Amino acid sequence: PVPFLVDLGVMNKEGRIITQKYDKFRQINRFLEFIQDILPKLDQQKEVTILDFGCGKSYLTFAMYYYLRELKGYDVNIIGLDLKTDVIEKCNGLAVKYGYEKLHFYQGDIADYEGVSSVDMVVTLHACDTATDYALAKAVEWGAKVILSVPCCQHEVNRQIKNDTLEPILKYGILKERMS
């Protein structure tokens, strides 16, 4: 088993994926495939700084650190940023627990973040509403070599979706959410 995946509730102590977290596990692994594809863009001879904006519970943040540092041997400094203080505290606790000295989490708004002067890679995975826009702007401002972004646009679309023909379906919240 991968210890951080156990603590984050994705895997059990026997190393099996929790059924309800299978989609999350697949999502993490797919994103790591993207990272594998861009490895030639990252300088393995120097520290690589990566920001994960809107990191949430940090499934991906921990996976990136583990993959890049433990499996691929990169000297990475990874920063996760999110609005939720309780989640950030938990993530920092796990980073300490595993001795991940160059993995840090901060509470804050992406639009106001000024914690670094340059980055090598900016990551956003389902950062909600305008968070992705701010993250992309920051990445460009810093001249990031790599930007990996999978926006979370369903919330924005959900508010705007209107269609008379589909109204019988859209009146049900769960179906409207799935449609968006």
Regions found by a protein language model. Name each.
Residues 1-48:
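Conserved Class I S-adenosyl-L-methionine-dependent methyltransferase catalytic core
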Residues 14, 83-180:
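Class I S-adenosyl-L-methionine
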Residues 23-30, 56-60, 83-87:
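Phosphate/oxyanion-binding active-site loops and adjacent basic polyanion-contact surfaces
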Residues 46-56:
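Conserved class I S-adenosyl-L-methionine
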Residues 47, 75, 119:
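Phosphate-coordination loops involved in phosphoryl transfer and adenosine-cofactor binding
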Residues 57-73:
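Conserved SAM-binding loop of SAM-dependent methyltransferases across substrates and taxa
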Residues 75-82:
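Conserved SAM-binding motif I beta-strand of class I
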